[in-house]
Amino acid sequence: DGRASDFAWTNPPKVDDTSSYAKLKLHLAYILTIPGVPVIYYGDEIGMTGASDPDNRRMMRFDDDLNENEKQTFKDVSKIIHIRKNHPALRYGDFLTLKADKNIYAYVRSDMNERVLVVVNKNSNNQKVEFILPGIYKVNKAKDLISGGEFTIKDNKIVLDVDGTKYIILKLEK
């Protein structure tokens, strides 16, 4: 009689755990800052869910049809895309891994004009991390490209507190 399909159509898949939005943003920050061409499937920029085929994704929703988590996800992802667009090292630069363990992945993207340090924390707990940057960098401060905050680098060492399931994108400066 079609009732099951009517139910599915009027009750689209939803995000069960709101921590999924933070995980999605962490993933998108990663793919937008590593080498290669980032691919974002439509709706990922808002955390849109899907179900099994043929209900992979519904029609795209905009503005007033988004919940607060989706609006914030879109805002945060847009900011990362803007950072990628305005910092060529994130698109074309060399890649140097500084740390890779079960919780933290940190790397620097460098070109002839700038160096950008990216730190992703996949753990749900805050992590204090310390990095010794290559001496050739000759940098003494870092600017957070998300918040605008500044960090001091002394003797090529930078210490950061990274919130749980978060990322930091820093421009290294002289």
Kindly give the residue locations of the regions a language model identified.
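Active-site and adjacent substrate-binding regions of carbohydrate-active enzymes
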Residues: 1-174
